[in-house]
Amino acid sequence: MNKVFIDGHAGTTGLLIRERLEQRDDIELLGITDADRKIAKVKQAVMHEADAVILCLPDDAARESVALEGINTRFIDASSAHRTNPAWVYGLPELNGMQSEAIISADRVSNPGCWATAFVLPVAPLIDNGLLPSNSHLSVNGVSGYSGGGRGLIERYETQQSEQPQKLWHSRPYSLGLTHKHLPEMVKYSGLTTEPLFQPSVGHYHQGMLVSIPLFAELFTNEVSTDKIFQCIADRYDSEPCITVHPPNDEAALDQGFMDPQSNNGTNRLDIYIFGKHSQILLISVLDNLGKGASGAAVQNLNLMLGMPELAGLKT
């Protein structure tokens, strides 16, 4: 039986990973007390015993854990500390045909950011196949449930909801300095050479994410259609069980004309939609920011690293 230690099990992502793994009989979860977590020797000992360690920590704390002396185990880091570090494998199995194998053999895997996952998967095939130039200037808009901000933001929103239900915070843009911490990985793994203009927002609901990427026809290297874009993206992910690429202008996926950012909650699924007409095209990704965008992705990577069925413990 494989032994797994979650370093930072009390946070939003750590709790959900623990919840998923506790239900399995092929994994033993190792634990230490909160007090012992602050004692380097105790933490080193449990890490040394583990077959894999999942870091659910702030960036600096994640770097410190990896740097502990005498640790010869495999790491999955759910923070953004190592996502563009060439010494770490990017934990997005669907990125290309070789990424799963890279994860299987890796000792250091960096779990992708939720926004980056939703952006990279629809955009990378278009750049890889020459439909979009790598120097394209793209814009990205997205909305996520407030759980994406961790325990502090969850508490703020739920307090507001209970104390002032008549004054709900609706969709609220943030990161208006245009320096969101997911941007470096969005650039690196999409194949772009320049940062997209990324404007995320938080919605007044717990979880679920929707990212939209508008594309004008003049951005493309040659004349394209929604059908051609669909074929390009669908061909990339036709064997990926977690990714569904919907046919162009799939109105059956809408709820009375609306796209629901919560439609994939509780799953490890990501849906890609293509809407538009000849001169304007809109790509939309929908995923659970706590599932495929965080805890589900970590479990998927863990399964690959430990030689287990890739989707063990996951709902697709």
Label the model's feature ranges.
Residues D26, V89, H137, E195, ...:
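A residue-level signal for beta-strand positions that form part of recognition/binding surfaces
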Residues D7-G14, A40, A124, D128-A253:
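Active-site-lining helix/loop region of Rossmann-like oxidoreductase modules
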Residues P214-T316:
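C-terminal active-site/capping subdomain that shapes the small-molecule cofactor and substrate pocket
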Residues M1-Y174, N264, F275-K277, A312:
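N-terminal Rossmann-like NAD(P) cofactor-binding subdomain of oxidoreductases
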Residues T33, N96, P200-V202, L287:
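Short, well-ordered turn and helix-capping elements at secondary-structure junctions
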